[in-house]
Amino acid sequence: MEPIRIGIGGPVGAGKTMLVEKLTRAMHKELSIAVVTNDIYTKEDAQFLLKHGVLPADRVIGVETGGCPHTAIREDASMNFPAIDELKERHPDLELIFIESGGDNLAATFSPELVDFSIYIIDVAQGEKIPRKGGQGMIKSVLFIINKIDLAPYVGASLEVMERDTLAARGDKPYIFTNLKDEIGLAEVLEWIKTNALLYGLES
């Protein structure tokens, strides 16, 4: 059976790599997991995961995309496929692959050929206007995460305004407020993945 592929996108510094690290740490004992990271000219995110995470090196592959990072997840997603195939060859029992995009703008989206589900993450420090600006990454993602809520008082951002604008832009599509550093909201993200992507709890 093919592993489920979940894309994680968002601007530089929003918390993509930390989200991947927290999710893999929480799930690696119950699932066979691997990660593909996309960086423009380095493999820094992959190296961070290997240093701070729980997955061994043979389960993490860094792809150097060059140029615009959204190209590697949308227009020319093919550069990710060899990494996915290599991970599947190394681990025939693979059940879940996280594909982290390089930091990009609000318009970046994942090709449906590359991922089964997409998560888009922003952080409060970028300003409360971000949800109002919309952007295809935020609007089209299956799950939207607003991270670093602990910083709201320090940057003058209103979580109520961000929630209102998120509802206006996304309708009834799910969103979660998080402070991943302190794992606030992490349980809700895990629950969403297990229920919606992995279909936990469904009768066979």
Swiss-Prot record:
Taxonomic classification: Bacteria, Bacillati, Bacillota, Bacilli, Bacillales
Signal sequence range: none
General function of this protein: Facilitates the functional incorporation of the urease nickel metallocenter. This process requires GTP hydrolysis, probably effectuated by UreG.
Subunit structure: Homodimer. UreD, UreF and UreG form a complex that acts as a GTP-hydrolysis-dependent molecular chaperone, activating the urease apoprotein by helping to assemble the nickel containing metallocenter of UreC. The UreE protein probably delivers the nickel.
Alphabetized Pfam families for the sequence: cobW
Intracellular or extracellular location(s): Cytoplasm
CDD domains: UreG
Family assignment from sequence similarity: Belongs to the SIMIBI class G3E GTPase family. UreG subfamily.
GO cellular component: cytoplasm
Keyword Ubl conjugation among record annotations: no
Molecular-function GO terms, alphabetical: GTP binding; GTPase activity; nickel cation binding
Keyword Oxidoreductase in annotation: no
Protein name: Urease accessory protein UreG
Keyword annotations: Chaperone, Cytoplasm, GTP-binding, Nickel insertion, Nucleotide-binding
GO terms of biological process kind: urea catabolic process
